[in-house]
């Protein structure tokens, strides 16, 4: 089974996605919360044994520095000549946002001209699984990364847990299908509530993605920070 998660163009693209969910000026977003979401995303990729490019890890180390400076009491003030890493980061995100917007505008103009003067290219790079409105499989993965962080903490604190590696995606799909037949819809948090190991959590997530892929369930989110909901698709 080949399950693809929408790739970002780089760490700034991921950060811009996280910042834009707050729908406010870049310089007003709760930067520590954004950093924690970024780090949770990277940790989840690693836990699922997915390859993480070096540039994402470099950014992660820079973000941890910014977070520590935010949370620790200020001992020395940053001199006027020294560049504040947080301000520098926000400036880079803002600059990247402008660049991306311009790039999208140019791409749109190019596509419009192609429609007028030639046959459109028959090219499908990746068809993302759509949730509702502007939501995508990436939003589902980001929501999952938060749950993953909580479960990792639970497992770490529960010394009686014995990891299994024989969980099957097909079994998890059957389990979710049974639950949804009884309840019609369920939140993403509820999906993982009874999972007691990281392997079980990861397998359950892959089963969820597969159900979305085969259109057995639909997924929606009422707003950017509410729980994602899975609903049984009537077929």
Swiss-Prot record:
InterPro entries named among the record's database cross-references: ScpA, ScpA-like_C
Pfam families xref list: SMC_ScpA (PF02616)
Keyword terms: Cell cycle, Cell division, Chromosome partition, Cytoplasm
GO cellular component assignments: cytoplasm
Domain of life: Bacteria
Subcellular location: Cytoplasm
Any single GO BP term: DNA replication
NCBIfam families given in the database record: PRK00104.1-2
Record's function text: Participates in chromosomal partition during cell division. May act via the formation of a condensin-like complex containing Smc and ScpB that pull DNA away from mid-cell into both cell halves.
HAMAP family, per database record: ScpA
Subunit structure and binding partners: Component of a cohesin-like complex composed of ScpA, ScpB and the Smc homodimer, in which ScpA and ScpB bind to the head domain of Smc. The presence of the three proteins is required for the association of the complex with DNA.
Membership in a protein family: Belongs to the ScpA family.
Name of protein: Segregation and condensation protein A
Organism: Streptococcus uberis (strain ATCC BAA-854 / 0140J)
